[in-house]
């Protein structure tokens, strides 16, 4: 007879409790708690702000302290440059891409809860497009000045940009804990140069957190106005910045100007007319944290399934697809144009196809880099890369060299020249090899236009003479000299050709000022200029990848330097090699590498005179033929060495 053992009923009750526990866990996710916290804060308690500062004045450190005080990050952890996500940002101490972080803060004076959005912006002029979009998302900004250095060039440039956009500015002096600082002097600089009231200035130490919670956070609450958007209007968002994720595609940093948007909503971009579905949505806290919705006044991220970061146009308006006709596009959109170009070629032509795929992947994360294929008669297939400015080019070039090292030949940077023809047409030239030569100029060209910049430099007075001489030798035109204080700090303004700026002007400035000068600049438009194309010729054949466009006054000096330098890297041949520099169809410099002689008489008897003459004549004729029809072999290492500074 079979016996059955019945299990106690209590096991079933245990399973029920377990199931109930799982349901409870599901309904209280961190994202939902976060969203519930946001819902309880009214729009008038939102504060969107950024930090305006020169390099190394403590912007990233102050950001870290704010995140710690508002409990976004653990104050006990070793926090350093939390908002600087890119490796190059951490290495150079600069911000390249705009970042944001949401913070919850309870005002101890009133007990009210506030939602703060810190928008960390790039400070350099190359990324001024990102800066202006970031500022447009803010109600105010912290104007941060280093107590040991005072006002610097980048501080001035970013102050005027923020001021022109109507931002409420909070002047803050950082590093007041250092013994060798003169806080009173820096206060005078701020009052005299920016006309801000002295009583509004706050002294802090971002490193130790001194006065950050006690004075700075209350000032952000009291002085910066809340966002002015309308929650009841149709949804529209300003696209502030974007970055590329290998799994999600382009991730968009957006400011919700009006209305609200939820996950799975159908949206459209005003400039590209492309339609998308919201795949993910949330805030940066400090990394991506899904919340399911964003509403008026918030700054957060959207994932729309964009496969290419170039689909994300900075300054574009994102709207609900169903309410396009009811929604007004946000003003001020402007496509960013590259201002510095370089050529890049694989040292071994066989690797072009593999490197082409790698190059395409590299530019995915930086929509402002333009990439076009080009072919050089000397270096083979390659690419022409366009950048926003000299720092942008330098950062990307550094990345290329880290990735590929000696596998890549990168030409000298050049700027776009505007050619005005006699028939009234205009053409922008970004490749020096395409620049009209002397013969074309005499027939078809009315004028050449060169891009200029307005440079702002701050430096100690003792280096003023050296810096003025440097600017004058680079075809500079002085605008203004301002003495910032009695301690000898000077602000110098100059018009300079952009071509000189990209030719290591900043390095030369640091050299003549022993590292004490700072530089910032802005676009000053095009001017008519007497520029010509300089070509390097080897046995009469121009090396297209090495062509440069220079002012007429510099051509002879650079031409002589070129031929001497290139001669060092070209090996001797069996025939004579002539290296020349040509401009306006005239040879302005020449160097000759003598032929390497082969001993054809080695096996002859000393008395065989007729045979000797015959062999020497044959050798001479052969060399002449080789020079006429043969191509000189120049190693890729020669090009790399020549292009190296």
Curated annotation (Swiss-Prot):
GO molecular function term, any single one: mitochondrial ribosome binding
InterPro entries: EF-4 (IPR006297), EFG_III/V (IPR035647), EFG_V-like (IPR000640), EFTu-like_2 (IPR004161), G_TR_CS (IPR031157), LepA_C_sf (IPR038363), LepA_CTD (IPR013842), LepA_IV (IPR035654)
Record field: catalytic activity: GTP + H2O = GDP + phosphate + H(+)
Broad class of enzyme this protein falls into: hydrolase
Topological type in the membrane: Peripheral membrane protein
GO biological process, one term: translation
Pfam annotation, one family: LepA_C
Subcellular location, record wording: Mitochondrion inner membrane
Keyword Lipid metabolism attributed: no
E.C. number(s) listed in UniProt: 3.6.5.-
Taxonomic superkingdom: Eukaryota
Signal peptide: none
Entry GO terms, CC: mitochondrial inner membrane; mitochondrial matrix
Chain positions recorded as GTP binding sites: 53-60, 120-124, 174-177
The entry's keywords: GTP-binding, Hydrolase, Membrane, Mitochondrion, Mitochondrion inner membrane, Nucleotide-binding, Protein biosynthesis
All residue ranges annotated as the tr-type G domain in the record: 44-228
Function: Promotes mitochondrial protein synthesis. May act as a fidelity factor of the translation reaction, by catalyzing a one-codon backward translocation of tRNAs on improperly translocated ribosomes. Binds to mitochondrial ribosomes in a GTP-dependent manner.
Note: This protein may be expected to contain an N-terminal transit peptide but none has been predicted.
Family membership: Belongs to the TRAFAC class translation factor GTPase superfamily. Classic translation factor GTPase family. LepA subfamily.
HAMAP family cross-referenced by the UniProt entry: LepA
Name of this protein: Translation factor GUF1, mitochondrial
Gene: GUF1
């Amino acid at each position: 007879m079979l016996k059955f053992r019945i299990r106690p009923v209590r096991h079933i009750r245990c399973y029920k409790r377990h199931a109930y526990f799982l349901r409870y866990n599901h309904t209280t996710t961190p994202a939902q708690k976060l969203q519930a916290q946001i819902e309880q804060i009214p729009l008038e308690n939102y504060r969107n702000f950024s930090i305006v500062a020169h390099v190394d004045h403590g912007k990233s450190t102050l950001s870290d302290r704010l995140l710690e005080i508002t409990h976004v990050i653990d104050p006990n952890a070793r926090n350093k440059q939390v908002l600087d996500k890119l490796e190059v940002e951490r290495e150079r101490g600069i911000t390249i891409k705009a970042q944001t972080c949401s913070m919850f803060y309870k005002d101890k004076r009133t007990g009210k809860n506030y939602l703060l959005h810190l928008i960390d912006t790039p400070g350099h002029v190359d990324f001024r497009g990102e800066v202006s979009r970031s500022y447009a998302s803010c109600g105010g900004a912290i104007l941060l000045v280093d107590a040991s250095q005072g006002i610097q060039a980048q501080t001035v440039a970013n102050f005027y940009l923020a001021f022109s956009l109507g931002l409420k500015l909070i002047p803050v002096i950082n590093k007041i804990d250092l013994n060798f600082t003169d806080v009173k002097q820096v206060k005078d600089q701020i009052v005299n140069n920016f006309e801000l009231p002295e009583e509004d200035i706050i002294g802090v130490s971002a490193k130790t957190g001194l006065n950050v919670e006690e004075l700075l956070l209350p000032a952000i609450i009291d002085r910066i106005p809340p966002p002015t958007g309308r929650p009841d209007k149709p949804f529209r968002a300003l696209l502030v910045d974007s970055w590329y994720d290998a799994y999600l595609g382009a991730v968009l940093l957006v400011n919700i100007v009006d209305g609200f948007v939820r996950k799975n909503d159908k949206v459209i971009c005003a400039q590209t007319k492309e339609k998308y579905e919201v795949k993910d949505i949330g805030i940066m806290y400090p990394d991506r944290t899904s919340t399911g919705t964003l509403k008026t006044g918030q700054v957060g991220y959207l994932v729309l399934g964009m496969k290419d970061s170039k689909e994300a146009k900075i300054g574009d308006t994102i709207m609900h697809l169903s309410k396009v006709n009811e929604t007004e596009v946000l003003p001020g959109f402007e496509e960013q144009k590259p201002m510095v170009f370089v050529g890049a070629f694989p040292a071994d032509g066989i690797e072009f196809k593999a490197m082409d795929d790698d190059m395409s992947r590299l530019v995915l994360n930086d929509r402002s880099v333009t990439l076009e294929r080009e072919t050089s008669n000397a270096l083979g297939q390659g690419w022409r890369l366009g950048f926003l400015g000299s720092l942008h080019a330098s950062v990307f070039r550094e990345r290329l060299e880290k990735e590929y090292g000696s596998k890549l030949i990168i030409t000298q940077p050049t700027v776009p020249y505007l050619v005005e023809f006699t028939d009234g047409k205009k053409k922008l030239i970004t490749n020096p090899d395409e620049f009209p030569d002397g013969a074309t100029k005499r027939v078809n060209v009315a004028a050449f236009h060169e891009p200029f910049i307005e440079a702002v430099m701050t430096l100690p007075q003792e280096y003023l003479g050296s810096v003025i001489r440097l600017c004058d030798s680079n075809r500079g035109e002085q605008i203004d000299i301002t003495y910032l204080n009695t301690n000898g700090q000077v602000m110098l303004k100059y018009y300079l050709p952009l071509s000189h700026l990209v030719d290591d002007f900043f390095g030369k400035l640091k050299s003549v000022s022993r590292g004490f000068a700072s530089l910032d600049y802005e676009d000053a438009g095009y001017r008519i200029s007497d520029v010509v194309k300089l070509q390097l010729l080897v046995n009469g054949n121009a090396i297209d990848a090495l062509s440069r466009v220079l002012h007429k006054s510099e051509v002879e000096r650079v031409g002589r330097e070129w031929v001497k330098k290139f001669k060092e890297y070209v090996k001797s041949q069996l025939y004579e090699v002539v290296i020349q520099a040509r401009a306006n169809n005239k040879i302005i410099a020449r160097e000759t590498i003598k032929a390497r002689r082969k001993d054809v008489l080695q096996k002859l008897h000393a008395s065989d005179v007729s045979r000797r003459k015959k062999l020497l004549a044959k050798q001479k004729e052969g060399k002449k033929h080789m020079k006429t029809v043969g191509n000189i072999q120049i190693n890729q290492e020669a090009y790399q060495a020549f292009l190296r500074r």
